[in-house]
Amino acid sequence: MSALRPLDKLPGLNTATILLVGTEDALLQQLADSMLKADCTSELKVHLARSLPLPCSVNRPRIDLIVFVVNLHSKLSLQSVEESLCHLDAAFFLGKVAFLATGAGRDSHCSIHRNTVVKLAHTYRSPLLFCDLEIEDFRAAMAQRLVRLLQICAGHVPGVSALNLLSLMRGSENPSLEDL
Amino acid sequence: METQSEEQAVTKPADSGGEGGPPQVAGAQAARPEDRMTLLLRLRAQTKQQLLEYKSMVDANEEKTPEQIMQEKQIEAKIEELENEVEEAKTAFEMKKLALDSVLMDNMKQILNLNKLIMKSQQETWDLEEKLLDVRKKRLQLKQASERKLLEIQTEKNKQKDDLDSMENSDKIKAIQQNLETEIQITTVIQHVFQNLILGSKVNWAEDPALKETVLQLEKNLTMI
């Protein structure tokens, strides 16, 4: 049960692997299906997991991007994500980790405040994406976005690296974040 | 306590050539080596980028991290410093890119100007050629007109000659010619008669000038007139 390291394995040719971590299995499966349907020139591999650490017995390729899916309706998902974050090598947070918060549309069901996830993302210096995974169109759009993100993190886009993208995305973030 | 984490993997095969769509039919066999080329080029770009990433990670790992345990605030201050450095490096890069772009822009503008000049000169050449063509056409027309005129003159001449010939061959002329000949013959006979009269009379016609003149006149050969 060792920590995941970002660059310990050699990349597969024309292959990009994404790991979706979250407690909501149905949502993850749906998101995985949307991602596989999206237009992409590289081979996509989607791995789903409830929490880290991952069992070592499985022979898996090098993971290029990890997306933590937090459901704003359940505190359990946030807790599980926070626990999983400890098992991650620090080198991953240089652009290969992203947070995805779902369920913000239905404000009455939200048990986690929006700012909590914002703070979490800020602590780990990673981008935070909001999406209602239950709605088909939003999910498809987010899947497309994740595919592009994955391509850059896997090094398939010449001229842009994961770190580059991180600083680019950070530049457009709300400057009021610094007050938190 | 660690929960047993499940893991599922789902994969999707790649579309060779990069276009999402139905697989190619036999008719597209000629396109496959090109697809392989594009695939190879794409793989090359990817491998380059990945190599760059690995290299930068190796370089980053060679840097020494501070051994002492610093306070959190100091760490944050250091982080901010480093971030500022990164921002400065980025802005310098952007400025360089802008400068290069402006040079590129100048080149493109020059190219555009030259293209305009070329087009103008080509247009002028075209106009001059058209004028040349017009002049040549006119010359041809004039030649043809002069040819026609000469032909007309020739036909006129021929007609005149024919008229003349026909005239000569007409019967009237023949009749007149006949008459003339008979008259000449008669006159010649009369001439001979008078000659013989005068000679037969054995008169010395050399002495009398009037007689001399008559005899000489009688010698005239009328067919020669």
Curated annotation (Swiss-Prot), chain A:
The keyword Transcription appears for this protein: no
Subcellular location per the Swiss-Prot or TrEMBL entry: Nucleus; Cytoplasm; Chromosome, Centromere, Kinetochore
UniProt entry keywords in alphabetical sequence: Centromere, Chromosome, Cytoplasm, Kinetochore, Nucleus
UniProt cross-references to InterPro entries, sorted A to Z: Centromere_Cenp-M, P-loop_NTPase
Pfam families named in the record: CENP-M
Gene3D superfamilies in alphabetical order: P-loop containing nucleotide triphosphate hydrolases
Superkingdom to which the source organism belongs: Eukaryota
GO cellular component, one term: cytoplasm
Oligomer and partners: Component of the CENPA-NAC complex, at least composed of CENPA, CENPC, CENPH, CENPM, CENPN, CENPT and CENPU. The CENPA-NAC complex interacts with the CENPA-CAD complex, composed of CENPI, CENPK, CENPL, CENPO, CENPP, CENPQ, CENPR and CENPS.
Function: Component of the CENPA-NAC (nucleosome-associated) complex, a complex that plays a central role in assembly of kinetochore proteins, mitotic progression and chromosome segregation. The CENPA-NAC complex recruits the CENPA-CAD (nucleosome distal) complex and may be involved in incorporation of newly synthesized CENPA into centromeres.
Name listed for the protein in its UniProt record: Centromere protein M
Organism: Bos taurus (Bovine)
